UniProtKB/Swiss-Prot annotation:
Name this polypeptide is given: GTPase-activating protein GYP3
GO biological process, alphabetically ordered: endocytosis; establishment of cell polarity; establishment or maintenance of actin cytoskeleton polarity; exocytosis; formin-nucleated actin cable assembly; regulation of protein localization; vesicle targeting
GO molecular function: GTPase activator activity
Biological function: Regulates exocytosis by functioning as a GAP for SEC4. Stimulates specifically the GTPase activity of YPT6. Also required for efficient polarization of the actin patches.
Pfam families in the record: RabGAP-TBC (PF00566)
SMART domains attached to this UniProt entry: TBC (SM00164)
Organism: Saccharomyces cerevisiae (strain ATCC 204508 / S288c)
């Protein structure tokens, strides 16, 4: 066979493919963007585990999978032990129409209205000498998978089902035809970027990436090649730095797990072990790699790894232990990283990117929801107008304040939504706890993770605002009930009627916010319509702003809780009776004291003044101005 050609069989068809030149007819190839699965699990694994893991190859591995390694499966069963290469039929049409323009405006971005166009970032069609060598892989492994009862056409390149309640398989396939070509072009640009940076790609698995820059951020936002994601996430999150400081820790945790099991096999020694076991089979049940076989009661290798990672984390950080949603974080990490690195990435996510979010009291997630509501109010007031009526309604019907305390009531209501969170946060809280896993389709989730690890946690707030902004059209379709979206407190609506009307509206808003993100199949929709648009103020949001805002919200919530307890109502945060001369257990607090405490802080977002980030107190700023004036005199 000639060196410049490859021959492979596609369902009894023999195809000759030139690696450089465009073919005259359509041909089927594997997408070059398949996850770079690890070659092995942790070194402490049993030999049986290792044998099963041999089915997980790298994207450029041409070895076939022996049926004996895969086990026997019934025609209706999906074997979770197969690798991604073996399972998917994410086959793409590599041929494009002659003369098709392939730059950012018509290719990557697909939107001529984009405000950021960079000449060094255009997806130009490479000539024969510089053309990306698209790896043409045979369908032998796919045929082997089919013989074991797996229909590849129903699953995406990560092993997830294409179809769900909001997206049909036909819609997915239609989108994938174009998006797969986008992935090919973006990977080629990444390769050129690394080569220009003196970081040549070897074995299609780069472990080093360029220093942070605006250009690299743009590349990350347009998507990291899927088979590079594990290494890229690890690099940007400084995972190796964390591992170097904790060498041998994960192995020690695994040995501790074994010792506990040997000493007390029937006694629960590990925190939340029962909950972890229960959630293992609830983790990505529709994903091929997580599905159990009738002949393997212990579950597929990735489930065993997931168990070890979650139990090890519970031992490593007993203050958090195990929190539901962590199984999805660890599960997705295991699709792209080996077991030990997945463990440390979970540690990094819970400590650096989402501090306190997974703590037992979940105060961290409440703080972040307060921050998100502040951001919605500031950056997308048009969406805030749908949330505010619920807050106003609650304040209007709150009978715990006496008429003599109107000033106290007014000052508390200014920041009330920070500690009495709006109903919508029951939905958006899961966005943060799971980092959008299960909230948006998998390709969009992975794009968000790319940006999260590169840009830090503020991107979660930014993309949340973008999703809410995109949902505005659906929110506008909600019909006001009893004038609930535009409350007029001078109306003659009775309390019950107004309450029911607002509750109905809250429910409809909740449904929109819960279901709309699940339709965002194309991640570029978020980026092209919102993130890359300079005219949206939400794109000014940065990590410094989020860090400051978190401190502000945490202080406000703590202050409210403290005064609630002092006033003898610590059992119910929702009702805080404040009356003049309240005497509780010898503590004498006047409404003026409460008013001073709860109204002293006001948050201000960065505007055009770079030196003014936020205001702790209007009075404090006045004092500072007076001091400066006195010094000047």
């Amino acid at each position: 066979m000639q060196n410049d050609q490859q021959r492979f069989s596609l369902q009894n068809r023999t195809v000759l493919a030139h690696p450089y030149k465009r073919l005259g007819g359509a041909f089927t190839v594997k997408s070059p963007s398949v996850p770079n699965f690890h070659d092995k699990m942790h070194s402490d694994h049993s030999s049986s585990d290792s044998a099963l893991v041999n089915g997980s190859f790298r994207a450029n591995d041409h070895r076939s999978v022996e049926p004996s390694c895969l086990g026997q499966a019934s025609p209706s069963e999906h074997d979770g032990n197969l690798s991604v290469i073996d399972l998917y039929g994410d086959e793409v049409e590599s041929q494009r129409a002659e003369g098709e323009d392939d730059d950012d405006n018509n290719g990557d971005n697909g939107n001529e209205d984009l405000e950021e166009v960079h000449s060094d970032d255009l997806d130009l069609v490479p000539d024969d000498d510089n053309r990306q060598r698209v790896e043409l892989e045979g369908a032998a492994s796919a045929t082997s998978a089919n013989s074991n009862g797996i229909n590849n056409t129903h699953f995406d390149r990560y092993g997830f089902k294409k179809q769900n309640n909001y997206i049909s398989e036909a819609e997915y396939d239609k989108w994938w035809v174009e998006y797969s070509q986008y992935c090919v072009r973006r990977k080629h640009k990444w390769q050129l970027l690394l080569e220009k940076s003196g970081l040549p790609v070897t074995d299609d698995s780069p472990s080093r990436f360029p220093s942070k820059s605006e250009r690299l951020k743009r590349y990350v936002r347009k998507g990291i090649p899927a088979e590079w994601r594990g290494n890229a996430w690890w690099h940007f999150a400084r995972g190796q730095e964390k591992l170097n400081k904790n060498k041998g820790v994960y192995s020690q945790l695994l040995r501790k797990m074994k010792q506990i099991k040997k000493q007390n096999p029937n006694e629960k020694q590990v925190q939340d072990l029962d909950i972890i076991e229960r959630d293992l089979n609830r983790t990505f049940p529709d994903n091929i790699h997580f599905q159990s076989s009738l002949h393997n009661k212990e579950g597929p290798p990735i489930i065993k790894s997931l168990r070890r990672v979650l139990v090890a984390f519970s031992l490593y950080n007993p203050k958090i232990g195990y929190c539901q949603s962590m199984n999805f974080l660890a599960g997705l990490l295991l699709l792209f990283l080996d077991e030990e690195r997945a463990f440390w990435m979970l540690v990094i996510i819970t400590s650096r990117y989402l501090p306190g979010v997974h703590n037992i009291n979940l105060e961290g997630v409440n703080i972040d929801q307060g921050v998100l509501m502040l951001c919605v109010k500031e950056y997308i007031p048009e969406v805030w107008s749908y949330i505010k009526p619920s807050i106003d309604h609650h304040q209007k019907n709150n009978k715990t304040f006496s008429p003599s305390n109107k000033k106290v009531l007014f000052n508390m209501q200014k920041n009330e939504f920070l500690y009495r969170l709006p109903p919508i946060t029951l939905c958006t809280a899961s966005w943060f706890m799971s980092c959008f896993v299960g909230v948006v389709p998998i390709e969009t989730t992975l794009r968000i993770w790319d940006c999260l690890f590169y840009e830090e946690s503020h991107f979660l707030f930014k993309v949340s605002l973008a999703v809410l902004k995109l949902s505005e059209h659906d929110l506008s379709k909600i019909k006001p009930r009893n004038n609930s979206l535009n409350y007029s407190w001078g109306s003659n609506l009775n309390q019950r009627g107004g309450s029911m009307g607002q509750e109905d509206s809250d429910m409809e808003i909740f449904q929109v916010i819960q279901t709309f993100p699940k339709t965002l199949l194309n991640p570029n929709e978020i980026f092209e319509k919102i993130i890359f648009k300079r005219r949206f103020n939400l794109n000014r949001l940065d990590q410094d702003e989020i860090d400051r805002c978190r401190k502000f919200v945490a202080a406000q919530r703590l202050k409210f809780k403290t005064y609630g307890e002092l006033l003898g109502n610590s059992t119910s945060e929702a009702d805080l009776p404040i009356n003049d001369n309240t005497d509780n257990k010898g503590i004498h607090i006047t409404s003026d004291a409460v008013n001073e405490a709860l109204s002293s802080e006001v948050y201000g977002f960065k505007k055009s003044l770079a030196g003014v980030h936020w205001n702790n107190s209007i009075k404090e700023k006045v004092k500072q101005m007076r001091k400066k004036k006195d010094k000047g005199d």
